[in-house]
Amino acid sequence: MNEKQILKLSRQYAKKQDFSINKDKKHLNFIIKGLKKNEEKYGYIFCPCRIITGDFDNDRKIICPCVYHKKEIKKWGHCLCKLFWRK
């Protein structure tokens, strides 16, 4: 997947979940690049803000969108990496 595809999928997911995507283009591009880098290195778009352990059973939880993002958005208004935001 290239960066445009990752961004497109992220936007589609956000729309489906009634979230928004970070409006700060610089931060958004930083996160998308991090997702792409992790895909190239590990084969999955792991959240660039979380630690990859090498134990896939554990690490699968941090494939974007990670299992934690909905609770984080509810609590803070955004996920840890600030890709997804509450509207």
Question: What name fits each language-model region?
Answer:
Residues 1-87:
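Long, distal/terminal scaffolding or interaction modules
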